[in-house]
Swiss-Prot record:
Domain of life: Bacteria
Coiled-coil region: none
One Pfam assignment: AAA_5
SMART domains xref list: AAA (SM00382)
UniProt-recorded name of the protein: Uncharacterized protein YehL
Classification via InterPro entries: AAA+_ATPase, ATPase_dyneun-rel_AAA, CbbQ/NirQ/NorQ/GpvN, P-loop_NTPase
MF terms in GO: ATP binding; ATP hydrolysis activity
Origin species: Escherichia coli (strain K12)
Amino acid sequence: MSPQNNHLQRPPAAVLYADELAKLKQNDNAPCPPGWQLSLPAARAFILGDEAQNISRKVVISPSAVERMLVTLATGRGLMLVGEPGTAKSLLSELLATAISGDAGLTIQGGASTTEDQIKYGWNYALLINHGPSTEALVPAPLYQGMRDGKIVRFEEITRTPLEVQDCLLGMLSDRVMTGPELTGEASQLYAREGFNIIATANTRDRGVNEMSAALKRRFDFETVFPIMDFAQELELVASASARLLAHSGIPHKVPDAVLELLVRTFRDLRANGEKKTSMDTLTAIMSTAEAVNVAHAVGVRAWFLANRAGEPADLVECIAGTIVKDNEEDRARLRRYFEQRVATHKEAHWQAYYQARHRLP
């Protein structure tokens, strides 16, 4: 990463992994789908890693799922990533777009206030009034740019967008053409170039907010992104991701392994309560891996900037409550019961230090 990008809070994948992308492109001898920057094997290696080429693994997911996603996009079908919040759907869509187009910047953030002109195109009203509708007065939105340049467009949280706005995608996904009725001649129709496609994401917890129409669903292939099931894999991911964030924050210490074990085990225990309906109460909070990474980062920041040391179990207690409790007071009591019924039963020193710090819970 170049020095001018060192001060970015979150560099895009194309910047963060520029060296890896260049290496993969240089060594890529496999055939590429039209409009793609990398072949399918090279794109798979970029996402899942390749020790032989010194390419890092960027997300924990089954290789078969990544292959299905790449094949879907290579056929021209839209890709819909669905799953619980915090399962790296957005990261996965960014990595896919970066591998295919070399850029993941054409992003639409869905929400209740999202309008059609934020998706397709708007107008520079000064030019529109002076010169009338023209390509010079047109302000291209991500979908217009993606079709014009042959790039992947990402649509985040599509189910949070009003239904009538979602359906503006129908023509682009089926006929690969965008019509501008205000324009005349050839400019009134924009035909998608090779390489254009759409990757959308949707949280299962938003189901029913703005349900997608059957017509729009038919134009996507759906792929469910599941939480990480293996404890060791989740622990490794939280450790590596939090270490990267702490280094970016200028902190010389990583979160100790014992504290990370407490964090990941707590998240998995509380997540299992919600899934398996055990004797413990169900939590309303989303105990995702992404949230665990944020807590680990907070533990390191708190320990270093407040006490000039590495993180300890007491720091974890201080940082974990805000993630688990949110705005639900009942979850506060459930978290306390977890400490009394689960944490107290562990005899290891770091678990006992964790339990002894329970008075720090708000």
